[in-house]
């Protein structure tokens, strides 16, 4: 059965995930390096990992299986999940796919380089109400896709 994993430390759509998962009876695991207040629901669990770079990502990549869904903005984690035949959705509602992940990794590396040399100093645009709406719709669609991967 499909499970949803949330890269939880800075995820702005946890409540939306809980809502959609509840509608479909899906288990949700939030992974982060600090305890978060979560709804009291037997289908929602929290895994706290030690602090450190990529500790949460490593745990999600270890647990995720084909047909599961990962909610993350982390492109390398998204790539690792796609390799395991999981589905990946960004909090802004844009999916990461096998077709888009290569470009996303290259763009990420380019942006890191530009920031390092001081050419670019900004980050991503702020999270907007339209992103939340797009996310809800995309997650609903992705749940149906996941059911086709793992009946």
Swiss-Prot record:
Pfam family, one: DUF188
Superkingdom of origin organism: Bacteria
Entry-linked InterPro entries: UPF0178 (IPR003791)
Coiled-coil segments on the chain, per record: none
Family statement drawn from the similarity comment of this UniProt entry: Belongs to the UPF0178 family.
Protein name: UPF0178 protein amb2838
Source organism (scientific name): Paramagnetospirillum magneticum (strain ATCC 700264 / AMB-1)
Taxonomic lineage of the native organism: Bacteria, Pseudomonadati, Pseudomonadota, Alphaproteobacteria, Rhodospirillales
